[in-house]
Regions:
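Terminal targeting signals and extreme-terminal segments of soluble enzymes
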Residues: 1-220
Length: 220
């Protein structure tokens, strides 16, 4: 676990764990991930070595069901279940509508909550398309609990693994929804991938109670 895939608190960023598992399953099964869900169980700290064991439960003509157990020694860090494959169909529809936001060049850079030059947070070019800068939080909730970022990943092409990383920006969305910084940890993340296209990260938060949060990232 290196600084570049860790949080500022020196543990593996949850989205990077799910992304690594997605990449491992796609490599082992030679099929694209269409759905994956991760259960986060423990922390992997910088400097530790995390192994990923891929188990292919069922492999059919068009669909594979597999899972990954990620562990540091005997300590399990996360478990990921996934479906992989594709089935040609004569239909191509999308019912999720992208929000109307300014183009990336017209949006300000997303400011950092804390100065940072080495964690996962430093590896993206993020533009705040809809939301409030950290230093302007005043307790005013975001309309409809919605915020949006333009995100450029200069080091990697867009992929299911990259979407898994971006999908873990729940603390950003929760804080935007309430207009205040609310630290939180991931219990589980789920991604569904229809077709990989250049897209924005649009975060909507429909539920928060007693520190259990539901958030989703449409458009993947």
């Amino acid at each position: 676990i290196t600084d570049g895939i860790a949080t500022r608190h020196n543990f593996l960023f949850g989205g990077c764990g799910l992304g690594a598992a997605v990449a491992a399953m796609e490599g082992e099964c030679d099929r694209p991930v269409v759905w994956a869900t991760a259960q986060y169980l423990s922390f992997a700290m910088t400097g530790e070595v995390m192994d990923l064991d891929v188990i292919v439960a069922v492999s059919g003509m068009m669909t594979t069901q597999a899972r990954v157990v990620a562990h540091v020694g005997n300590r399990e860090i996360l478990t990921v279940n996934a479906a992989l494959g594709e089935k040609p169909l004569p239909y191509d529809e999308q019912w999720v509508t992208m929000p109307e936001v300014p183009s990336p060049g017209d949006c300000p850079l997303r400011s950092d909550l804390v100065a940072d030059g080495k964690s996962i947070m430093s590896r993206f070019d993020m533009r705040l398309a809809m939301g409030t800068p950290w230093d302007a939080f005043d307790g005013t909730p975001a309309p409809g609990a919605r915020s949006a970022l333009w995100v450029h990943t200069p080091e990697v092409e867009m992929s299911a693994a990259a979407i898994a990383i971006l999908g873990d920006y729940v603390p950003f969305g929760i804080s935007q929804a309430f207009g205040d910084w609310i630290p939180s940890n991931s219990l589980d993340n789920t991604i569904r991938v229809h077709r990989l296209e250049p897209t924005e990260a649009d975060r909507k938060v429909p539920y928060l109670q007693d520190r259990v949060q539901l958030s989703h990232l449409p458009g993947a």
